[in-house]
Amino acid sequence: MKFNILNLLSITLVSFLMSCAGSEPTDVQVEDPAIEVEVEVAEAPIDDIFYQVPSPNDLFNVLKDADISYNKEILNDLSRVESLNSKKAKALNFGVYAADLAYVSSLGQIGDASPIFETIRSLSKELEIENAMNDVIYSRIQDNLDASNPDSLFSLSNETYYKAYAYLDNNDRGDVLGMIVVGGWVEGLNIILNCQDYNDSSEVVQRIADQRLTLENLLVFASRIQNEDLDNIIAELAPVEELYNGLVVTEDSDFTTDESEDGVVVFGGGSTVSFSEEDFNNLKSIVAEIRASIIDGTL
């Protein structure tokens, strides 16, 4: 089944939450971000509208402006790749390493980016998706590694991720695509949950809370791929879904719409999400457990 990355509906799903609170747990009230939707009237039935799947870079944009210290210990050990024996394990961990590359690039750690890039390149060959990233892409990435250009590398890591996405989409390999997306999302969420303690005013924490929307998006995407292995992987995300579904959401009656000059309709308002330190810590524990089963190849 085909999944068009740049189809009719593009949903901007960003905003997360986290940092350090005092002895009394507090709830952070987070407004759902505006949703920007490009509307093309009567072009296709609903079944042909596919949600855009986020790349790991979407999570880490906030780190570039936040006062976040780099923590290499968060990354997946590159030596683990040698023990990955199944297509499922390799695809999930391709996503994991793609998220790691986005993280180190976002914080300008060029020295750690190069070996991660080589690991991704190796996995792409084993998954038979090396054609998704031709020699021009590899050369551009290597040039930016050599020039210590983190901003361009961050952009290229995003491009590489979507090149793999498009290649798998166009070649009817939705199972591998779904696994890569899940692996990248779980690793990205684990990283951002561990980059600082809970703080009810942190923009990073805001990102974490808003991942409830990204998860909904991911589940819709995965549900369109008929594959038993992927279904089993998605089932492991049930505790994360349950936690997000348990958050208190207050609907905002002030809902607005506007249209930009280029025809993009922007929906404002929406709802407010309460995300406490307890929610944060529970999510951190759940995600760490899922991530552990991915990187050791047992999921």
Identify the role of each PLM range:
Residues 1-9:
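Bacterial N-terminal signal peptides that target proteins for export
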Residues 16-19:
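C-terminal motif of bacterial Sec signal peptides marking the signal peptidase cleavage site
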Residues 21-24:
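Bacterial signal peptide processing site
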Residues 30-143:
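N-terminal Sec/ER secretory leader and immediately downstream segment
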Residues 76-83, 95-103, 216-223, 264-274:
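Acidic/histidine-rich, surface-exposed loop or edge segments in extracytoplasmic proteins
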Residues 150-237:
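Extended amphipathic alpha-helical interaction segments
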Residues 221-299:
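A cross-kingdom marker for long, charged
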